[in-house]
């Protein structure tokens, strides 16, 4: 039975690597997949999904107002049977798009695998993540480690000096130099201004100011 899956984590846990491996596993068995990627994430090039370890694949771009159920229906009409839809950076989905993906599962009987962040740099849920957590059939955390050795569950945005950025837009694309995964305790610490973090040396502990 087709299901809606949400694989969530903090930054740098290997979400995109896992997505690309899943897509490869389907294709290896002669099954066709469709990878969806948000237009605003163009770090690897428009329509390209790429992991930090070098894996890459072409994806279909969607915008915030794209009807995803209709997109999938057109894909099936044009290219034939579809065995899986995979969504990269799923935190950027709108509420309506999460519902549309649930319709892909329930009406079209195509499994949908979504990969994304759970919370933003303020510790608040993204819209897409909020409704995936509410509506997905299966939830799975992809784990990663904080420099403190604890499980990283939060993402902090830092400036060039390694200090926490607490204001600004929720959606701002950046790589390892802007965002760092930390435990909840370390998140509280740096948000209080107690030290700094070097985003290029994420193994180092936070020094106390």
Curated annotation (Swiss-Prot):
GO terms for molecular function: ATP binding; thymidine kinase activity. One of its GO terms (biological process) is DNA biosynthetic process. One of its GO terms (cellular component) is cytosol. Gene3D superfamilies: P-loop containing nucleotide triphosphate hydrolases. It is found in: Cytoplasm. Its main location: cytoplasm. Its EC number is 2.7.1.21. InterPro entries: P-loop_NTPase, Thymidine_kinase. The active site is at 89 (proton acceptor). Keywords: ATP-binding, Cytoplasm, DNA synthesis, Kinase, Nucleotide-binding, Transferase. It is an enzyme of class 2 (transferase). It comes from the Bacteria. It catalyses: thymidine + ATP = dTMP + ADP + H(+). ATP binds at residues 9-16, 88-91. Belongs to the thymidine kinase family. Homotetramer. This is Thymidine kinase.
